[in-house]
A protein has these predicted regions:
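Extreme N-terminal segment that seeds HTH/winged-HTH DNA-binding domains in transcriptional regulators
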Residues: 1-48, 53-56, 60-65, 76-78
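Minor-groove-contacting beta-hairpin "wing" of winged helix-turn-helix DNA-binding domains
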Residues: 70-76
């Protein structure tokens, strides 16, 4: 799915950008555990599925890593 010029970004991309900014600005430093996806959805006032898609984007960018049973963490800086 592509975006048209002049249209606002898709919601999951906006959420991914917001979380990425928090990581880049040091609010979530490398190695820190992120809130759960459900908690993030509540804090950002978006649907749970939106946060799940945003996390996929951040994982693909290498910004976060998920350890099953432990949670999602900010990846070490490269």
């Amino acid at each position: 799915m592509t975006e048209s010029p002049g249209r606002p970004p898709l919601e999951y991309r906006r959420v991914a950008g917001a979380i990425e900014a928090l990581i880049e600005n040091g609010y979530f430093p490398p190695g820190s555990k992120l809130p759960s996806e459900k908690e993030l959805a509540g804090q950002l006032d978006v649907a749970y599925g939106t946060v799940r898609r945003a996390m996929v984007v951040l994982r693909e960018r290498g910004l976060i890593l998920t350890i099953w049973g432990k949670g999602t963490f900010v990846a070490p800086r490269q």
